[in-house]
Design a protein with these regions (language model features):
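Acidic, low-complexity intrinsically disordered regions
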Residues: 1-202
């Protein structure tokens, strides 16, 4: 259960969830024979359910694949479920555009911002995605004003290396605003709140 201090910290943030709907999300390599897409639905719904108790006006949501990046504001768990029912994995991974859309949603209030990106593969725009993060970092006034947490779904080693580079080795940033976790690392946390607090403090 979240402590009063944790809840007080997270109440200072708006939250945006970005969901990778690229073709590789259909890969069935999650424990129990599940697809990455099915597993991510379960994980995203849980994340939204937990954080909607803190962010009462609803979460921001970005869904991205191929040339299609969609944004939704003020979503709840039912909207997350609807998004998954209406889509199936296809196309490539336009991460830079997705991050730009997430930052636009996040910047609608004076609160600090937390963006969580569920993704499984290397984006088709690696350098552009890194530039979006770098530019966002350099606009911040404090190191906790913006946090971007990547959670890698699946086991693509190239994707893992890329996300860890964004976390540990991205050059030219005013602040380190990125944290990256594998799904196994994320699941070790007792709660969504603990995971988010750790990413903010990282």
């Amino acid at each position: 259960m979240a402590t009063e201090q944790q809840i007080a910290t997270l109440s200072e943030y708006d939250f945006v969830v970005a969901i990778d709907a690229s073709g590789s999300m259909g890969t069935e390599d999650i424990k129990g024979g599940r697809s990455r897409w099915a597993f991510m639905q379960e994980t995203a719904e849980s994340f939204c359910r937990d954080l909607s108790k803190i962010d009462a006006d609803g979460l921001g949501l970005v869904v991205f694949s191929g040339t299609n990046v969609e944004s939704f504001d003020g979503v709840d768990v039912s909207k997350i479920s609807e998004v998954f029912k209406q889509r199936s994995p296809r196309g490539s991974t336009p991460l830079a555009e997705a991050l730009s859309a997430a930052l636009k949603l996040a910047g609608k209030s004076d609160k600090k911002d937390f963006i969580i990106v569920f993704t499984d593969g290397v984006p088709d725009d690696k350098d552009a995605a890194a530039k979006v993060i770098r530019d966002a970092s350099n606009k911040q006034e404090t190191d906790d004003a913006l946090t971007i947490l990547f959670v890698q779904v699946g086991y693509d080693t190239d994707a893992g290396r890329y996300l860890k580079m964004l976390d540990d080795d991205l050059k030219g940033c005013k602040f380190d605003i990125v944290d990256a976790k594998t799904i196994e690392e994320a699941e070790k946390f007792a709660s969504t709140v603990d995971l988010v607090i750790e990413a903010i403090n990282d």
